[in-house]
Amino acid sequence: MKQILNILPMFIFFIFYKFYDIFIASGSLIVISGLICIIHWILYNEIDKISLFSFLSVFFFGSLTIFFHNSQFIKWKITIIYIIFSLVLLISQFFTRKPMIQRFLEKDIKISNIYWRKINFIWSLFFLFCAILNIYIAYYFSETIWVNFKVFGFTSLTFFLILITSIYINCKISKNK
């Protein structure tokens, strides 16, 4: 349920963009992200950090997009978020006892710390790659291509890395048995 709630805003944004424009889509993104925080609160008695961070970034960049009537703000949102994710993972890689990915998944997955560090580093590089790719697509392609890639391209890339990570983890779990 949480995963569906977390990806719903992206598809609402896409639908509103297709029927209206980037500015109405940005407004819809702000509204649906706020509603998701409320739904999280009602269902789970808490708002998880990712949903709150997502709402605050959508509110900030979406509001700037609408207020200045400039789509560059919403285009930069995803780049900045990816850079933040990359930096958080990278900082946890070198300056904390456990990498961030391990903190999220170690309750369910038991593998050596060295493998967690490799996975964490790969995901940090992935987010940096996505940030650069987003800038490239936003500036060298049409807005429609950017929206389509934002929704379907980044989702596909993320699912692909999740699949590769799962296979890698499964191999390491099998070796530990």
Curated annotation (Swiss-Prot):
Pfam families: IspA. It comes from the Bacteria. Its main location: membrane. The chain crosses the membrane at residues 22-42, 50-70, 76-96, 121-141, 149-169. Signal peptide: none annotated. GO terms for cellular component: plasma membrane. Plays a role in cell envelope biogenesis, maintenance of cell envelope integrity and membrane homeostasis. Belongs to the YciB family. It is found in: Cell inner membrane. Coiled coil: none annotated. InterPro entries: YciB. It comes from Buchnera aphidicola subsp. Acyrthosiphon pisum (strain 5A). This is Inner membrane-spanning protein YciB. HAMAP family: YciB. Keywords: Cell inner membrane, Cell membrane, Membrane, Transmembrane, Transmembrane helix. It is a multi-pass membrane protein.
